[in-house]
Amino acid sequence: MNIIDSKLNFKKDKLLVRRMTEAIVLHHSCSKGQTVQQIHLQHLNQGWSGIGYHYYIRRDGKVYSGRPQFAVGSHCQGHNKDTIGICFEGDFRKDKITQEQIVAGKELIEYLNESFNKKLKVFNHGELYPTMCPVINLKEILTNGNY
């Protein structure tokens, strides 16, 4: 799995270590053309330690590192302590997910399952928190209903 190191600087004193990992939560960025660095800066300006997602998948299918994998995320209120957050570039209210993103998303889920040596549950953000994110059923698209 090729994951591009985004070389992001975090407020280390605010990063908490995740003790267990049970699931993956899928998101869309709600914007097109936004880089992982721009999201990181936006989240820093909100007072967070940095980007809340662990991975960011651009429309070309390139996967970028976000928040360190060992750290508690900031992407799904009430479910950050035991989940990994994956964000897909795009506003899926009007943009279609690209085939490159689908392939990269499937590969990333398999990579994470191997990394944690178990089959992680997969959720759309809206299944765990009242939001329209990610608008489309990413879970079904990426897992063929097998999670």
What are these regions (language model features)?
Residues 1-25, 62-63, 68, 79-82, ...:
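Basic/polar, cationic surfaces and motifs that engage anionic cell-wall
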